[in-house]
């Protein structure tokens, strides 16, 4: 349900979030100067933390590797759709599937299905741009003639009215203004073939919140995302070893 995509099955539009994819108190000293210095130190620390996060997070309107980020959301969902349900990275509870079918310079962190909080451990090659789903929804045409405009309206309604409490931290530092990281595909796209060679590729539209990150420095990092879809809390923690 959440940090991934919304598969068919539940909710007023027949969707379940996937999931890609189930964040001083100053002592009142006698010496006012000491309090001022402590306050200044806290302010500078907060400023440094914000600057550090801002240097990692890529704005949603920025082009990444010659593609708008809405196209990267399509690529993420097509990556997820290529797996059978029981082998999907979205169903992975440990991180064992984090490297499955990853290719290119953008590395997808799979969302979760919302059934329970998930913590995954994953080794990520150095130099990879990270694509992190927070929460998203997918509308599929099934075997019907696709009505892309109508499907896009339903997907947008799901995100606008059913999603709340967005949160993301990188190494304990909050990512601000997650609302600005909403991506919608608008046009229909092929979600891929999985059932049989004779299957017709399902057309789909998607809407949701995703965050693209600059390659992280080598070493351990923790990314945590949370959201709520209707009354369902969604929580995924990624413990990454960049090397």
What are these regions (language model features)?
Residues 17-34:
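Bacterial N-terminal signal peptides that target proteins for export
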Residues 43-46:
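N-terminal signal peptide c-region/cleavage motif recognized by signal peptidases
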Residues 52-97, 242-243:
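N-terminal segment immediately downstream of the Sec signal-peptide cleavage site
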Residues 106-189:
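Extracellular-facing segments of soluble proteins and assemblies that are Gly/Ser/Thr-biased and enriched
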Residues 128, 217-220, 224:
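A glycine-anchored, Pro-Gly-centered beta-turn/N-cap motif
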Residues 192-194, 198-210:
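Aromatic sugar-binding surface patches on proteins
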Residues 228-235:
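Short acidic/polar inter-strand loop motif in beta-rich domains
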Residues 236-241:
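C-terminal edge beta-strand
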């Amino acid at each position: 349900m959440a940090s991934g995509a919304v598969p068919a099955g539940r909710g007023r539009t027949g969707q379940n979030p996937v999931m890609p994819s189930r964040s001083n108190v100053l002592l009142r000293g006698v010496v006012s100067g000491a309090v001022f210095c402590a306050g200044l130190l806290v302010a500078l620390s907060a400023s440094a933390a914000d600057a550090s996060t801002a240097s990692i997070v890529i704005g949603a309107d920025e082009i990444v590797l010659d593609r708008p980020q809405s196209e990267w959301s399509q690529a993420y969902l097509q990556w997820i759709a290529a797996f059978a349900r029981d082998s999907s990275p979205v169903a992975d509870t440990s991180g064992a599937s984090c490297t499955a079918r990853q290719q290119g310079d953008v590395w997808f962190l799979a969302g979760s299905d919302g059934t329970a909080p998930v913590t995954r451990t994953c080794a990520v090659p150095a130099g990879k741009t990270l694509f992190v789903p927070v929460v998203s929804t997918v509308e599929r045409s099934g075997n019907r003639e696709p009505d892309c405009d109508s499907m896009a309206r339903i997907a947008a309604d799901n995100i606008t009215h059913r999603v709340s409490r967005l949160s993301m931290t990188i190494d304990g530092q909050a990512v601000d203004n997650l609302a600005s990281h909403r991506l919608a595909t608008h046009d229909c796209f092929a979600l891929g073939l999985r059932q049989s060679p004779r299957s017709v590729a399902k057309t789909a539209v998607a809407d949701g919140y995703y965050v693209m990150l600059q390659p992280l420095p080598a070493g351990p990092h923790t990314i945590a995302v949370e959201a709520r879809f209707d009354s369902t809390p969604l929580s995924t923690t990624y413990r990454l070893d960049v090397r």
